[in-house]
Swiss-Prot record:
Cellular component GO terms, alphabetical: chloroplast; mitochondrial small ribosomal subunit
Gene3D superfamilies according to UniProt: Glucose-6-phosphate isomerase like protein, domain 1, Helix hairpin bin
Signal peptide: none
The protein's name: Small ribosomal subunit protein uS2c
Organism annotation: Nicotiana tomentosiformis (Tobacco)
Localization in the cell: Plastid, Chloroplast
Keywords: Chloroplast, Plastid, Ribonucleoprotein, Ribosomal protein
The encoding gene: rps2
GO terms classed as biological process: translation
GO molecular function per UniProt: structural constituent of ribosome
Any matching Pfam family: Ribosomal_S2
Chief place where the protein resides: plastid
Amino acid sequence: MTRRYWNINLEEMMEAGVHFGHGTRKWNPKMAPYISAKRKGIHITNLTRTARFLSEACDLVFDAASRGKQFLIVGTKNKAADSVEWAAIRARCHYVNKKWLGGMLTNWSTTETRLHKFRDLRMEQKTGRLNRLPKRDAAMLKRQLSRLQTYLGGIKYMTGVPDIVIIVDQHEEYTALRECITLGIPTIYLTDTNCDPDLADISIPANDDAISSIRLILNKLVFAICEGRSSYIRNP
């Protein structure tokens, strides 16, 4: 895999608060190699290492995108939801930003059935068929459609399990992470100082609580994916 330059700037990461970890009492000892200091009771992440692993992640997603691979971005906590949706839409990725439904990947046949139902209901709404049903039936189906839109709207065009999954918060998305591990799907995630860096294929040491940090990391990954997709379009 060819290494590329992704304009990862340490000062920019500091301004975004990427280096701020959790309180020193809430840390995972496995993160010791990625911590450079303690300041006012919190751990400080070594941004040089962050830059290294973020660059590796960008290389990986560029290479995958240039070969037409599919990505899923997962981040369901309120702070991350908008950034996840923005990043996914920009890079034409699938995303989950409301709630991870258990078995979404490991029980793909059930997810596929739900997606078929979702598409059918969307078509019925688009054609006006729902409005021609009795009010009670129409109301029930509209509630069902709204629920499916909330939880599956970001994966409505997904036709199979993704090739790479990007996860914003290890603890919040642990079920999604375990499903990826079970299926052998490569994962990239932000690794705060209270996380286990050994569970992902590429762990990016970074603050997974600050919106500015999440947005910066996703922005770099999304740029690499877009560049890779452009390469794929030029050289199919």
